[in-house]
């Protein structure tokens, strides 16, 4: 070995550099232990940036000495003494590990021992205590194999050599080697890396071994970050990350004598574990239970209670984790495919060197993300285990051409798509339990209603096909078309609508809560009547229940007597009803024009009004606001009912008390007994009472003053017969030209209605028939004797009205097809004609909408789309003919061009 160059220290560093850094040079005659002590105390790799230049010079000297030693070994001038040994208890594995070798003879010749050690390869220089000669420790050719001895020990076999319990079974051959360091590196089959290197755990004496692939020598600590290489990661199928930490066992408090006496028959608690053993095993379905491959094994005692082991296990098979606490039996945990980011390896001791040579056991390369960890139950008190894994493409076969690794992304969702989602989710605010219950009740009711409507359409189609005597092939075809229509309707209901989809043509009406406008749909160019209600006014005047009832009856209505609803939607300020446009005007406008109707014309309108009321009652509603303003006339002179703003369906969603104040919704009558019933018998079931009574009466004061029934004003309870009172008042106004109980003073009209016997005047009746006067008297009377109030069902009660002598000769079946000279036919030139309405200019309020009305749960389930909205028109009465019959097609193969004179509005 050549002497140290002048101006250099024994470790190869320049004395000038040491003086520049303010460090005193080390004497050349210092012993190896003193030098190592000084080296460990002064030079700490990666700690003091001021030492970087010194370390660089040391590494250069180290490389120069390695070349000389290689030449010296080639000449065979050195031999390894048989008495040389390596003390594993003196080996530590830190950022730089130093090994002390002792020789049995101080005068022995300088020798070089060849030991495969990753820790030694990271050291800068080594010296012997005796002759002062340097010892170059180079890796030796070893191919590590693994076997289980059954005693939780890892045994490695290297040809004819074996290392057991940290002691070499045979000494290293002293035969001179003529091979250089570069020529003895091993490249195991199936691995891309070179130089297998055993390592040593710093916390115990058992040797630990690194993977079959080796890492290149560590780069200079002052090198550029670009040259810094991370630990390579092999391609894996299921990557499971295990994070294990052992805590010191907390001593239990002194036992309580009372508890000891109480639990004297119980077994004493086990002693605190002196050691925690962690092992990781993998099993495949092809292998048996007795052929388990152990990937990792380590032991940690009390001295290393704060140490942490963090590894990754990559295996397509089941992986088992055995955690044993001596003297307790071991426990097993099955690793599931859970994903987590890898933990930063800088947090753990000997992280790189505790890995077995197996491609399924790979190091961690990502940053720490402790929030994703999930602890496993039933673990020892002093051991923490957290794990997760993620699925990855299967690893390529080494005997086949390897494919490029898959591209890994940090997040499966693009940031541009994720930001709007996060922004919108912040707008979601928690709600009160009553509000959630309110929404769920309405939502479930709407789902049930949609199911009933779908079944109804199916039965109606089957009934029509039976009446048309269609063959089975045609029936199946029609049923298939209906299913396609149902699917399309389901998709249409999910599409959100807004006011921007329509263009306002003119405003034709105004009410207490909103206005009515003639609009045109932008995509179909069809004309509709749009009724808009301001949410703030609806909430302030407590009309949410009435709006809900109006929406329900318009959505459920399937009759030519009712104005059809096509869409309903809402925005932050208003509720919108998109309805059928009836261009003939209303009955009030006609009364103003004519003054008094002829008896035949009055009979015709009252007969059609009776049919409309019958339909409303059949679907379970009460209009409660019948007046000439709410009776529209189509272009053929027939009537349609509209404005169901005060309608009630005798349902809990139509009860104003159910809505209550905002965010405080209580169904006061849904699951509670009436006071009079509860006082009689408390054992009566709620459902039985609700089924029997079915909300027979209502108690709210509604309707227009001149047409209200006396029981409505007195709040004694009213039922469907109140609509027949309003019918009698309308008939009186038609034939007499005035309302019967009008008074100009406030409250005078209600006083006259309550005392109707004193104020009902039949003078100046003109040429009215006795039957007409009798009809008025039997409608404007007490509810007990009123027409339409007796009978078990709606049909029987309505028959009392239809069978009156005044209606003798009325064809109730073909009433809507009636064409007569006395029928008023409004003048309509085109579908956007508004000459029969009084138009006005819109004066929209510029005020911001009331915040209380924006997210009020009273408007849940308000959106609606008609089933036939795709093939219907805004003004159905303008359609020239009804749908063609399929019978001529089946009989003659062609359609019959002739169509009957049937009103097409009933076929939309």
From Swiss-Prot:
It is an enzyme of class 2 (transferase). The keyword Heme does not apply. The keyword Metal-binding applies. CDD domains: MobB_LATS, STKc_LATS. ATP binds at residues 508-516, 531. Residues 808-874 form the AGC-kinase C-terminal domain. Expressed in muscles and epithelial tissues including pharynx, intestine and hypodermis. Expressed in vulval and spermathecal seam cells. The active site is at residue 625. It is found in: Cytoplasm; Apical cell membrane. GO terms for biological process: apical protein localization; defecation; G1/S transition of mitotic cell cycle; hippo signaling; negative regulation of protein import into nucleus; nematode larval development; positive regulation of apoptotic process; post-embryonic digestive tract morphogenesis. Its main location: cytoplasm. Residues 115-134, 162-183, 203-225, 388-412 are annotated as: Disordered. GO terms for cellular component: apical plasma membrane; cytoplasm; membrane; plasma membrane. Disruption phenotype: RNAi-mediated knockdown results in larval lethality in 50 percent of the animals. Surviving knockdown animals have several defects including a slower growth and a partial distortion of the pharynx. In surviving L3 animals seam cells are 30 percent smaller. Interacts (via N-terminus) with yap-1 (via WW domain). Phosphorylates yap-1 which may negatively regulate yap-1 nuclear localization. Plays an essential role in larval development. Regulates growth, the formation of gut granules, lifespan and cell and body sizes probably in synergy with the TGF-beta sma/mab pathway. Does not appear to regulate apoptosis and proliferation. In addition, may synergize with the TGF-beta daf-7 dauer pathway to regulate entry into the dauer stage. Maintains the cellular integrity of intestinal cells by regulating the localization of apical actin and junctional proteins. This is Serine/threonine-protein kinase WARTS homolog. The gene is wts-1.
């Amino acid at each position: 070995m050549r002497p140290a160059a002048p101006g250099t220290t024994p470790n190869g560093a320049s004395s000038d550099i040491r003086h520049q850094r303010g460090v005193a040079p080390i004497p050349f005659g210092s012993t190896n232990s003193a030098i190592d002590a000084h080296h460990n105390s002064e030079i700490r790799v990666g700690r003091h940036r001021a030492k970087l230049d010194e370390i660089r010079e040391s590494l250069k000297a180290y490389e120069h000495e390695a070349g000389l030693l290689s030449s010296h070994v080639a000449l065979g001038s050195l031999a390894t003494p048989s008495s040389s040994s390596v003390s594993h208890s003196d080996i530590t594995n830190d950022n730089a590990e130093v090994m002390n070798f002792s020789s049995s003879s101080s005068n022995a010749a300088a020798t070089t021992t060849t030991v495969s050690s990753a820790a030694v390869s990271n050291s800068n220089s080594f010296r012997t205590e005796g002759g002062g000669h340097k010892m170059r420790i180079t890796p030796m050719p070893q191919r590590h194999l693994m076997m289980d001895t059954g005693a939780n020990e890892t045994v490695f076999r290297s040809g004819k050599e074996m290392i057991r319990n940290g002691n070499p079974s045979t000494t290293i051959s002293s035969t001179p080697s003529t091979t250089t360091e570069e020529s003895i590196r091993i490249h195991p089959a199936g691995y891309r890396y070179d130089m297998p290197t055993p390592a040593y755990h710093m916390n115990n004496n058992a040797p630990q071994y690194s993977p079959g692939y080796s890492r290149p020598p560590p780069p200079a600590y002052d090198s550029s970050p670009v040259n810094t290489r991370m630990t390579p990661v092999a391609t894996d199928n299921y990557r499971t990350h295990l994070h294990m930490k052992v805590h010191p066992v907390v001593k239990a408090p002194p036992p309580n004598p009372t508890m000891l006496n109480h639990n004297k028959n119980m077994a004493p608690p086990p002693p605190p574990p002196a050691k925690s053993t962690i092992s990781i095993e993998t099993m495949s379905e092809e292998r048996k239970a007795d052929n388990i491959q152990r990937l990792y094994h380590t032991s940690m005692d009390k001295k290393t209670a704060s140490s942490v082991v963090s590894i990754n296990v990559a295996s397509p098979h089941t992986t088992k984790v055995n955690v044993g606490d001596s003297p307790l039996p071991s426990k097993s945990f099955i690793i599931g495919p859970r994903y987590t980011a890898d933990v930063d390896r800088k947090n753990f001791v000997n992280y790189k060197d505790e890995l077995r040579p197996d491609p399924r056991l790979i190091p961690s390369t990502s940053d720490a993300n402790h929030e994703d960890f999930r602890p496993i139950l039933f673990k020892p008190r002093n051991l923490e285990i957290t794990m997760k894994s993620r699925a990855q493409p299967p690893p390529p076969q080494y005997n086949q051409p390897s494919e490029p690794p898959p591209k890994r992304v940090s997040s499966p969702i693009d940031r541009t798509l994720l930001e709007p989602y996060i922004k919108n989710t912040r707008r979601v605010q928690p709600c009160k339990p009553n509000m959630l219950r309110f929404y769920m009740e309405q939502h479930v009711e709407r789902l049930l209603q949609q199911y009933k409507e779908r079944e109804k359409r199916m039965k109606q189609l089957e009934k029509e096909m039976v009446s048309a005597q269609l063959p089975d092939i045609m029936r199946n075809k029609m049923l298939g078309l209906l299913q396609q229509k149902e699917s399309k309707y389901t998709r249409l209901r999910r599409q959100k609508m807004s006011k921007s989809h329509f263009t306002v043509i003119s405003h034709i009406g105004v009410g207490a809560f909103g206005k009515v406008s003639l609009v045109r749909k932008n995509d179909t160019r069809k004309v509709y009547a749009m009724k808009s209600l301001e949410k703030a006014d609806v909430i302030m005047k407590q009309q949410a229940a009435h709006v809900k009832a109006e929406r329900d009856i318009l959505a459920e209505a399937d009759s030519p007597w009712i104005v059809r609803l096509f869409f309903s939607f809402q925005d932050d300020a208003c509720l919108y009803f998109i309805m059928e446009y009836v261009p003939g005007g209303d009955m009030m406008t006609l009364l103003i024009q004519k003054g008094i109707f002829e008896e035949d014309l009055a009979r015709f309108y009252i007969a059609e009004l009776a049919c409309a009321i019958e339909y409303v009652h059949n679907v379970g509603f009460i209009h409660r606001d019948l007046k000439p303003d709410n009776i529209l006339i189509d272009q053929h002179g027939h009537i349609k009912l509209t404005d169901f703003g005060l309608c009630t369906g005798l349902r809990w969603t139509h009860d104003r008390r159910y809505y209550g104040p905002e965010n405080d919704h209580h169904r006061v009558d849904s699951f509670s007994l009436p006071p009079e019933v509860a006082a009689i018998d408390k054992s009566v079931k709620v459902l039985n009472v609700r089924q029997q009574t079915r909300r027979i009466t209502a108690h709210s004061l509604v309707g227009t003053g001149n047409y209200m029934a006396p029981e409505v004003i007195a709040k004694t309870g009213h039922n469907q017969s109140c609509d027949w009172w309003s019918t009698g008042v309308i008939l009186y106004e038609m034939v007499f030209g005035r309302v019967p109980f009008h008074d100009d003073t406030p409250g005078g009209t209600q006083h006259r209605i309550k005392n109707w016997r004193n104020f009902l005047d039949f003078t100046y009746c003109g040429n009215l028939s006795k039957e007409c006067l009798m009809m008025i008297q039997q409608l404007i009377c007490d509810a007990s004797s009123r027409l339409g109030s007796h009978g078990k069902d709606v049909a029987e009660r309505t028959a009392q009205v239809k069978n009156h002598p005044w209606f003798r000769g009325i064809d109730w079946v073909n009433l809507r097809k009636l064409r007569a000279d006395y029928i008023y036919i409004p003048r309509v030139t085109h579908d956007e004609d508004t000459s029969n309405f009084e138009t006005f200019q819109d004066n929209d309020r510029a005020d911001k909408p009331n915040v209380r009305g924006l997210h009020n749960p009273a408007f849940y389930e308000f959106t609606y789309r008609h089933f036939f909205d795709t093939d219907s028109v805004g003004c159905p009465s303008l359609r020239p003919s009804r749908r063609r019959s399929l019978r001529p097609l089946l009989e003659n193969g062609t359609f019959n061009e002739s169509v009957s004179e049937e009103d097409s509005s009933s076929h939309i």
